[in-house]
Amino acid sequence: MRREMQEILPGLFLGPYSSAMKSKLPILQKHGITHIICIRQNIEANFIKPNFQQLFRYLVLDIADNPVENIIRFFPMTKEFIDGSLQSGGKVLVHGNAGISRSAAFVIAYIMETFGMKYRDAFAYVQERRFCINLNAGFVHQLQEYEAIYLAELTIQMMSPL
């Protein structure tokens, strides 16, 4: 299961790079994947790369898997990409190298903001579907900070006149 992608929400999948390799094209097509978010470190760019640019729409993010990497700045972009795909009837695969830390953090952030969930609840929700997730401590801290950020934005939106 760790080397395969799992459907976290209808149309939103999380997995390792191996689930997006050339040999997995039939599986991607079977699941109806139309968009792929590829999260990798700069040093991984030679072997973790978009394999099907002619078939899928890609968002490629070069993000280090270390506790001091600022991932919050990428959340709005990834949410817009996922929302755009799902609203047009598409399906999205979010992958990193192993599908355990970076890519899981982005899926958790998406679920938190989309459904107004707290970090702990969103983490548990994703882990029920992809058991092997294990975020680095810095990403956990940033997701906990992000909870306060998006909840404050939500409060402001609710208080604003139409």
Locate the predicted segments by residue.
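Intrinsically disordered, low-complexity regulatory segments in eukaryotic proteins
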Residues: S160-L162
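Cysteine-based protein phosphatase catalytic domain of the PTP/DSP
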Residues: M1-V94, A98, F106, E113-L154
